[in-house]
């Protein structure tokens, strides 16, 4: 991967790179290197099928190595822990999973934006695109393990040519990394544009699934929306870092004061039904847990002037705060911090606010 990573052109177009969440334990320096040198167009996803290479269904030999949702649940729970530690939001399954197994991922991998499966068939699709248990998008990579632009183009050509613009069309493919690079993806986009001018968007996996959630009426991470604006109290780093989708230390928001108090405010430009929020503190970025934000509250507003409390946390020591709140309609969200941790300088690695279109 390091050879591909150093190829000229990386960062010019969104690409999703599969890595192992186990790097947290057996290769933390490697994981840090990739995060530290990633561009805003590089997105990391978990390789098959979570923590370690697990071949659940062998498509070539038509063999289920496991077909039990109960049997796979401990593995999925363990995977969830390492997804949080590694910051990975997408898993590509090797090759397929059944309904019981999809339910296990939906139930125990709360951190996931979505799953991709490997569809080895030709059109029409063998594997359906679906939302598992009303909260986890599952999309097939068709083609999978494509060895060049021509292969992907041949699979997508007819579908894109028939696109009428009435609703979004989501397509996912997997390329052989040792045979494809950024230049190939650029060439693919140019060829697809000729089929449907102005309608082709190549995007990161986290953005892909976030847009899919929005298009299908599911709660989605509002902080990834392109029109959101962020304001903060005095800070040492850019306010954009509180909602860039990364919990890496170099992309952490840091308060400009050390009096323990700080605030972060989002304007989503219109009202949404807010139902969940996630705060990733200093510990989630690899810093000591003693620097995690201790006391804070989530406030909501429709005009940016009158605020109401939606949730309050006191004495927090955990690196991640993940809370389902009573659904509330709001345009503005504010995180108000009153105790920033050991040195009283607030550090927020990332914030996610989940809402649905009204």
PLM feature spans:
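Non-catalytic propeptide/linker segments at domain boundaries
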Residues: 1-10
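Catalytic grooves of carbohydrate-active enzymes
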Residues: 1-2, 22, 86-216
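Metal-dependent polysaccharide deacetylase catalytic core of the NodB/CE4 family, i.e.
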Residues: 18-100
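Short, solvent-exposed loop/turn segments at secondary-structure junctions
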Residues: 22-25, 51-53, 97-99, 176-180, ...
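Extracytoplasmic/secreted cell-surface and envelope-processing proteins
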Residues: 26-27, 54-57, 100-103, 125, ...
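Short, surface-exposed amphipathic charged segments that create phosphate/polyanion-binding patches used
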Residues: 59-68, 129-134, 216-218
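Predominantly extracellular/luminal regions of secreted and cell-surface proteins
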Residues: 219-247
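Aromatic, loop-rich ligand-recognition surfaces of beta-strand-rich domains
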Residues: 236-237, 246-309, 314-358
């Amino acid at each position: 991967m390091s050879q591909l990573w150093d190829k000229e052109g990386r960062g010019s177009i969104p690409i999703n790179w599969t890595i192992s969440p186990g790097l947290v334990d057996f290769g933390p320096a490697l994981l840090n290197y990739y995060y530290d040198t990633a561009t805003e167009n590089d997105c990391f996803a978990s390789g098959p099928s979570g923590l370690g290479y697990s071949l659940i269904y062998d498509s070539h030999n038509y063999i289920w190595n496991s077909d039990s949702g109960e049997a796979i649940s401990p593995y999925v729970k363990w995977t969830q822990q390492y997804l949080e530690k590694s910051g990975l939001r997408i898993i590509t399954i090797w090759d397929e999973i059944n309904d019981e197994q999809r339910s296990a991922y939906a139930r125990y991998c709360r951190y996931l934006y979505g799953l991709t499966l490997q569809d080895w068939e030709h059109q029409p699709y063998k594997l359906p695109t679906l939302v598992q248990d009303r909260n986890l998008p599952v999309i097939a990579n068709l083609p999978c393990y494509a060895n060049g632009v021509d292969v992907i183009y041949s699979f997508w050509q007819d579908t894109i040519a028939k696109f009428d613009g009435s609703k979004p069309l989501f397509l996912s493919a997997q390329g052989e990394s040792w045979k494809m690079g950024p230049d190939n993806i650029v060439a693919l986009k140019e060829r697809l544009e000729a089929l449907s001018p102005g309608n082709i968007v190549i995007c990161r996996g986290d953005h892909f699934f976030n847009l899919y959630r929005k298009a299908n009426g599911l709660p989605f991470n509002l902080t990834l929306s392109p029109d959101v604006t962020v304001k903060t109290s005095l800070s040492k780093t850019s306010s954009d870092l509180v909602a860039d989708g990364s919990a890496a230390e170099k992309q952490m928001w840091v308060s400009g004061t050390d009096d323990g108090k700080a605030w972060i405010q989002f304007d989503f430009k219109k009202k949404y039904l807010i139902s969940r929020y996630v705060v990733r503190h200093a510990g989630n970025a690899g810093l000591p847990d003693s620097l995690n934000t201790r006391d804070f509250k989530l406030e909501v507003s429709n005009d940016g002037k009158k605020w109401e409390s939606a949730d309050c946390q006191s004495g927090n020591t955990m690196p991640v705060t993940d809370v389902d709140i009573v659904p509330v309609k709001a345009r503005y969200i504010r995180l108000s911090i009153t105790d920033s941790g050991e040195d009283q300088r607030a550090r927020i690695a990332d914030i996610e606010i989940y809402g649905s279109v009204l």
